[in-house]
Amino acid sequence: MAKKVVGMIKLQLPAGKATPAPPVGPALGQHGVNIMGFCKEFNAKTVKQEGLIIPVVITVYQDRSFSFVLKTPPAAVLLKKAAGIESGSGVPNKTKVAKVTEEQVKQIAETKMVDLNASSVETAMKMIAGTARSMGITIEG
C-alpha cells in the first residue's frame, strides 16, 4: 500500500547551503520531518550547482518520512548568471542593464525544458526571452 501524503512543501533554496534556519526549519518542522536529514540530502544532491537557487518540492508522508524533487533553477537566476549581473532593471522598458546572446538563451531554454510546458526549444526560447525582457536584459543575435 502506498504511503499517505500529508503535505507538499515548495521551497527555493541556495544549492548546497540548506540549513535548519528559516525558511527550511519552520516549513519542515510543522510537518514533523527530520530537518537535518533533509538538509544533508538536499546539500549532497545540489553540491554541483553551487551559487544557484534550486526550487524543491518536498512530499511529506503520514509516517513523517519525506521525498523531494529538485526542479531547474528559475529562468531569472540563470539569466542573471549568464549576463553576469546581480539584479535586473527597476524600469526594464527604459533602463537596460545587460546583454545576452541568442546562444545563451538557447542554452537556458534547453536547461529549463523539463520544467516548462513548451513543446519545442524555440517556444522555450521565447519564454526565456520574455523573462529577459521583463528584467531589462537585451538579447543579441
Swiss-Prot record:
Transmembrane segments: none annotated. GO terms for molecular function: large ribosomal subunit rRNA binding; structural constituent of ribosome. One of its GO terms (biological process) is translation. Gene3D superfamilies: Ribosomal protein L11, C-terminal domain, Ribosomal protein L11/L12, N-terminal domain. SMART domains: RL11. Coiled coil: none annotated. The keyword Nucleus does not apply. Keywords: Methylation, Ribonucleoprotein, Ribosomal protein, RNA-binding, rRNA-binding. It holds the Pfam family Ribosomal_L11. Belongs to the universal ribosomal protein uL11 family. This is Large ribosomal subunit protein uL11.
